[in-house]
């Protein structure tokens, strides 16, 4: 009887072959242990128009992705894999990033990108692109420590090294003592007194004073500008502006030598050419009748006319 019952059950499995062909895998036997879900069953045919099935719980700890999810909409090109690194000299900004990369990248964290000069770029030979070492203004001098230092405004021109340490003087006219002799735009002029203006500082170099004298026996001197290293030079004649020339201390050049006259009161004297005492240094139209001294008054040579604009004082700073 028991054998007949087992045969009957076997016969039922034969009858189920047709059902299996029509409906796929038969339900598990009631006495058989349950099979792990989703591991040993054959996958059904994928229907692209069928609703998305509920994904089974993951068996392992891998990261799960939604099956067949459409790629996200992006305003910039979408890449399945990270974009290749940019070539040297060009930086690309892509609208996505690697999961292991911080955002924003460290070298673009503060403000927009500016292409530095090639001298401030270094490539270390890796595959991460260009490394930006520093971004500096080409317009400011940099020290090795990266600290900006102003140029040494007190540094003498090279040709005046022999005059270093000597006291400087200011030169002003009796017509306007608050205006000093200075250099501006390559010309000798008068400007409001400013002791901090190096161009208003002059050296009275008397190197050849014992060798060269004027017709009255007065010793010569040169007026050398501390800021430019230029000496005031004779003009081509009366009514013409004086000139400037690079001073060469070891060269005797009469065209840069001047003398002072006798004292006309309060220490004011005329300044005239060593080889022509008739022509005097003159603040052009600086006398009161002509309008007086102003900022930018031109310095010329003129015949003596007894004006205050022809009387000068050379006084230490």
Curated annotation (Swiss-Prot):
Q: Which InterPro entries match?
A: Ricin_B-like_lectin_EULS3-like (IPR040249), Ricin_B-like_lectins (IPR035992)
List the biased-composition ranges (Pro residues). 25-36
In residue numbers, the region (Disordered) covers 1-157
Quote the tissue specificity entry: Expressed in roots, rosette leaves, stems, cauline leaves and flowers.
Induction entry:
Induced by osmotic shock and salt stress. Induced by abscisic acid (ABA). Induced by methyl jasmonate. Induced by infection with the fungal pathogen B.cinerea and the bacterial pathogen P.synrigae pv. tomato.
**Where along the chain is composition biased (Polar residues)?**
136-146
Task: State whether keyword Cell membrane applies.
Answer: no
Question: Where does the record place the Ricin B-type lectin domain?
Answer: 168-315
Q: Which GO terms describe its biological process?
A: defense response to bacterium; stomatal closure
Keywords, comma-separated and alphabetical? Cytoplasm, Lectin, Nucleus, Stress response
What one GO molecular function would you report for this record? carbohydrate binding
According to the UniProt record, one GO cellular component term is:
nucleus
Q: Where in the cell is it found?
A: Nucleus; Cytoplasm
The UniProt comment on domains reads: The ricin B-type lectin domain binds glycan structures.
Q: What does the miscellaneous comment read?
A: Plants silencing EULS3 exhibit an aberrant abscisic acid-induced stomatal closure.
Which PANTHER family does the annotation name?
A: RICIN B-LIKE LECTIN EULS3
Q: What is this protein called?
A: Ricin B-like lectin EULS3
Organism ancestry:
Eukaryota, Viridiplantae, Streptophyta, Embryophyta, Tracheophyta
């Amino acid at each position: 009887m028991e054998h007949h019952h087992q045969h009957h059950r076997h016969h039922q499995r034969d009858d189920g072959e047709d059902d299996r062909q029509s409906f796929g895998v038969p339900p598990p036997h009631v006495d058989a242990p349950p099979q792990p879900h989703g591991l040993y069953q054959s996958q059904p045919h994928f229907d692209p128009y069928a609703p998305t099935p509920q994904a089974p719980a993951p068996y392992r700890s891998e990261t799960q992705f939604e099956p067949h999810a459409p790629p996200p909409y992006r305003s910039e090109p979408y890449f399945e894999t990270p974009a290749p690194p940019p070539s040297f000299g060009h930086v690309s900004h892509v609208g996505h990033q690697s999961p292991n990369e911080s955002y924003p990248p460290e070298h673009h964290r503060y403000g927009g990108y500016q292409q530095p000069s090639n001298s401030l770029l270094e490539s270390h030979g890796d595959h991460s692109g260009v490394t930006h070492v520093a971004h500096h203004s080409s317009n400011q001098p940099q020290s090795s420590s990266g600290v900006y230092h102003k140029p040494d405004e007190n540094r003498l021109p090279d040709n005046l090294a022999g005059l270093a340490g000597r006291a400087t003087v200011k030169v002003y006219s009796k017509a306007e003592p608050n205006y000093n002799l200075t250099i501006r735009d390559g010309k000798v002029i008068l400007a409001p007194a400013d002791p901090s203006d190096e161009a208003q500082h002059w050296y009275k170099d008397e190197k050849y004073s014992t060798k060269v004298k004027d017709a009255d026996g007065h010793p010569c001197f040169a007026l050398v500008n501390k800021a430019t290293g230029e000496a005031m030079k004779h003009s081509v004649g009366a009514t013409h502006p004086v000139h400037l020339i690079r001073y060469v201390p070891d060269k005797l050049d009469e065209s840069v030598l001047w003398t002072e006259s006798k004292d006309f009161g309060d220490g004011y004297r005329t300044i005239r050419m060593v080889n022509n005492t008739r022509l005097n240094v003159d603040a052009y139209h600086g006398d009161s009748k002509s309008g007086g001294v102003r900022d930018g008054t031109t310095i010329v040579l003129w015949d003596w006319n007894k004006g205050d604009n022809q009387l000068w004082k050379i006084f230490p700073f």
